Structures are given as C-alpha cells and as structure tokens.
C-alpha cells in the first residue's frame, strides 16, 4: 500500500532538528508513505522551509518531498499590513523562479474562526485574491486553508477559474462538496475524520468523487484518535486512510491507490 501525504508541516520547530525530521521521513517510508508535500506558512520561514526540503531530499531519499510557498491567513496577524504588498511581490518572484521541489502555491486561504481573528476578513480576502491571481498566471495549484469561510471561498473561486487546487483538511459540509468539485478541485481529509463522533467529515468523505479524494496528516497537528497524545507525523497517514475507507465502505488499499494517483495528477508529478 502506497500513500501520499499532501499536507505535513515537517519544517516546523516541533519536529526538532534535521535529524528528527529525517527520522520522521524514515518512519513514514516504513509505513508506506511514498511522497510528502510540505507547505509554507509565513514569508519569514520560506528560506528555512526550502533548506529543510533540500536536506530531506538529499538525506531521506526513501520519500519524495515536494513543497509549496504561500502566506497562511493565520500568519497575517504577525505580518504588518503595510508589508502585505511587498510580501506578495516576493512570493510572486519566488514562485516564478520555481525553486527545486516547489509544485504548488500555499498554504493560503481564509480563516474566519478564532485563530484567524488577528487579520480582518477584508485583508484575508485581499491576500487570497493575490494568491489566486498568481495561480492563474503560473498554472500552479493552490493549497487552500478554509475555516468557517466556505461560502466566501466559493464566491472567490467562481469569479475566474483557477487551476485545480486542494481544499486542505476539509471542514465544510457534504452539501458543499459538489460545488468545489465542479471547479475541478480536490478535497483532502486529515485526522479529524478519525475522531469517534466525527460525523460531518465522514459524510463529506462519502460525497467526494473518487477522482477528487486526497489524504493528509497536517502534521504536527491533528493527531489521529488512536495515536493521541503523540505529536502527529506522516507515518500516521495510514490511520486516516483507514478512516476514509471505513466512511466510504471501500477497501483501504483502494483508497490508497486512488488518492496517491489523484495527488500525482493534480500536482503534475510522475509516478
């Protein structure tokens, strides 16, 4: 069984130093994870992210590593609004230079929950619009964070087409799944679907067409239920695959096969 973790923050300080990141990669490979996508969060850590990915590519070749650059909506609270345009211009320059391993734009999006309250909704929308324009200009997919803002995100995506993108750690309803999929986008599920009373993500997982289904850990956050209180890591993606398989009443091997193929197709990666 081969799995693709489409969202894991292996570069975060919670994974310690380079040695600990490499060990996490080896554990992931032993669990059947063949590829991991590590997204950016804030401009000040882009260089460290690219260095971490380069190190993993060189020293943990048991897993194929990819990355993305963007500005997370929660990171806006720490960014002076006067710097927004400069940060977005720097992002565009980085993306156009296409550093090794960069296959997407993000993590970016909208967070209208408490964690995103440090930036106004208007500011979040403006920053996301810039990411959407960059995706249109480059043809790269987006890694979209969306919390309590699905209707607004749908409106933005409907204004002008963007390349097929990923709804990361989907928290919306099953009823909204068709609207996102009509735009060509994929829906990714994380550890929340493993929780005992997680009815909403299970219903959503059933509603996603097979060719739009993805898996992720969102490590180090969202540890699957059976692994708590441990820090989450890509090796635990197996638990999420099993939970999605159970929700859809399908063999876990079939879920692994289709989600890995979907990720490679959307990110335009060779098998």
Show the residue positions of the predicted features.
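Mid-domain alpha/beta scaffold segments of enzyme catalytic cores
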Residues: 1-271
């Amino acid at each position: 069984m081969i799995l693709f973790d489409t969202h894991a923050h292996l570069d975060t300080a919670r994974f310690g130093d380079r040695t600990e990141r490499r060990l996490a990669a080896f554990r992931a490979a032993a669990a059947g994870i063949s590829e991991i996508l590590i997204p950016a969060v804030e401009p000040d850590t882009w260089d460290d992210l690219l260095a971490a990915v380069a190190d993993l590519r060189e020293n943990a070749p048991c897993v194929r590593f990819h990355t993305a650059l963007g500005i997370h909506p929660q990171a806006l609270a720490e960014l002076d609004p006067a710097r927004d345009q400069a940060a977005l211009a720097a992002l565009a320059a980085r993306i156009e230079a296409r550093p090794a391993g960069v296959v997407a734009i993000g993590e970016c999006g909208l967070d209208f929950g408490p964690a995103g309250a440090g930036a106004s909704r208007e500011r979040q929308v403006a920053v996301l619009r810039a990411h959407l324009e960059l995706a249109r200009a480059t043809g790269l997919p987006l890694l979209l964070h969306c919390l309590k803002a699905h209707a607004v995100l749908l409106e933005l995506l409907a204004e002008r087409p963007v390349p097929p993108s990923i709804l990361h750690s989907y928290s919306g309803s099953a009823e909204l799944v068709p609207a996102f999929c009509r735009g060509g986008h994929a829906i990714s599920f994380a550890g929340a679907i493993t929780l005992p009373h997680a009815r909403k993500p299970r219903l959503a997982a059933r509603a996603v067409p097979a060719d739009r289904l993805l898996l992720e850990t969102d490590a180090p956050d969202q540890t699957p239920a059976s692994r708590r209180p441990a820090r989450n890591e890509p090796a635990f993606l197996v638990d999420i695959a099993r939970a999605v398989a159970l929700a859809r009443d399908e063999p876990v091997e079939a879920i692994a096969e289709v989600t890995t193929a979907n990720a490679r197709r959307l990110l335009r990666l060779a098998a």
